[in-house]
Amino acid sequence: MRFYSYEECVADAKILARQIRDEFAPEVILGVSRGGLALAQLFAEYLDTRLCFSLNSIHYKGDVKLDEVEIFNIPELGGYKRVIVVDDMVDSGESMVAVMAKLRELFSQVEFKLVTIFYKDKSLIKPDFCVRKTDEWIHFCWEVEL
């Protein structure tokens, strides 16, 4: 397991924000709850936008994998053209494949780009913007042990 610090996150988010701004110029930031919320907020600051929304995606309840990915609280994105979908990591990619498919089904006129800090080679989907590849389990600085 690897701990991913706040300082690393800020440095990586700045790199990604510059790349996203220069190559895509999104109108909207869409964070996937919960892992993508901290990053979505950082991107909203760096890209100077208040159009920062979230949706929920659940693939596990506790340690039990659900038969289907639950996706809910999807904001209305029909009036926009370019949206980044932000999460902390793509692991197996199953959840993100479902999220991206649902968004494209609902908003076919919108161009979606996936942004993560980490992804794994075994993932079913590769992010459009990413700074780190890993095979390790990542413990993010925003994951609190209560």
Feature roles, as predicted:
Residues 1-146:
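PRPP-associated nucleotide enzymes
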